[in-house]
Amino acid sequence: LVGLAFKVSAVPFHMWTPDVYEGSPTSVTSFFAIVPKIAGIAVFIRFMYSPFQNILDQWQYILVFISIASMILGAVAAINQKNIKRLIAYSSISHMGYAIAGISTGTESGFKSTMIYILIYSAMNIGFFAFVFLMKRSGKYVEEINELSGISKNHPLAALSLLIVLFSLAGIPPLAGFFAKFYIFMSVIESGMYTLAIIGLITTVVSAFYYIRIVKVMYFDNPKKPFESFKDYGIYGSLIFSSIFLASFFIYPSIFNEIISKINVF
C-alpha cells in the first residue's frame, strides 16, 4: 500500500510531488501527471480486487484515510498556488483521493468507477498540458497563472478549450469530469460509506475555486503580451479533441462502463 500510494502521490506520501512537478521540464511534468497515475491505479485495482479482497476489513480503513487526506490536502493546498505546475500537482493529489475512494469500497462497481475516473482524468490532463505546450513566450512555456491574463482575447478557441478542461476537472455538469466523480460517489454511497461521500462532495466544491480562478484570469483580466503563434498543430489538435470529448461525453456516458464489461476486466 505504501509503495502504490507513493506512486500515485497520495497523502501522506505526496511530499515529493509539488517540487518535482514545478522543478521538472514541462514535458516531464506532463508525463508524471498522467502515465504513473494510470499505472499506479491499475496495479492498485489489480491487487485489491484479487489477492487482498478477502481481507477487505484489514485495508479498507487505511484506504479511506488516504482518500480523505488526499482530497482535503489537494483541494486546500492548491487554493493559493500561483505556479501552474505546482497547482496541477496538488490537483493530482486531490484527484487520486477520489480514485482511491472508489477502490476503498472493495466492490466491483467501485473498481469500475475508478477505472472510468482515471481514463477521464487522463483525458483532462492531456488537454491541460496540450494547452500549456502551446503557450510560449520567447521560447519558454507558461509557468505562472497570471501569464494567462486576457488570453481569451488573442486565442479564443484555445481559451475556450481550456475552460472546458478546467470545468471538467472541477466536476461541473454535464462535462465528463462530472460523470467521473458521479460514478465514484455512487459506488461509495452504495457501500454505505456516507461520510467519505460527503467529504468528497465538499472538497469538490472547494477545488472548483482554483479552477475557476484560472478562467477568471483568462477572460476578465487585462491582456498581456501575446503568446507566440501556434506552430504544432498536433498538440493544438490534442487540445481541441480532448475538449470535444469532455464536452460531448454526456451524450453516451456509459461507454466506458460497457467497454470494461465487454472485455471482462472483472
Regions found by a protein language model. Name each.
Residues 1-266:
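Alpha-helical transmembrane segments of multi-pass membrane proteins predominantly involved
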